[in-house]
Amino acid sequence: FSARPLTAETEKNMSLVIRQHTETQFAQELEELRKSDARQRPPNWTLSPWAVTVYLLGGQLDNGFEVTPKYIGNRRLVEIAVATLATDRALLLYGVPGTAKSWVSEHLAAAVSGDSTMLIQGTAGISEEQLRYGWNYAMLLAKGPSHDALTPSPLMRAMELGKVARVEELTRI
């Protein structure tokens, strides 16, 4: 077996992103909504509930900018989801596979927090402890159990920063 050197074409293709994070892919729309949104925002929200709804369902802004719809469906469901997030309650999107639950949650997180990457992928092997934090084992061995040895999970980071955390496949946990 001999390794062939990478060509410029191969290196270029390896650097391509398959799918950008939502807040990157739709950055222009989110920025236009931010600029034209003078409505009241809940604490730590980047957009008002009205703007989050427009971002998901699409529409034309006062300045003529067209926001593309991300969700084609019942408007009332989106309004209820956004209103729920504006309270101190959690939002559970429940349904059969292929009904855009992950898609909607990713866009909600991007519009509300400006960050859709606070994600925990549920598996049968994840414990309640792992939902909150992990351990830096090198630090744990060197210094023993301490705050420095803890590695915060996406859920813990979201709570510290006041952002939306998403848990995918909750029923597997």
Model-found features: residue ranges?
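Long, compositionally biased low-complexity segments enriched in polar/charged residues
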Residues: 1-2
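AAA+ P-loop NTPase catalytic core and its hallmark functional loops
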Residues: 6-173
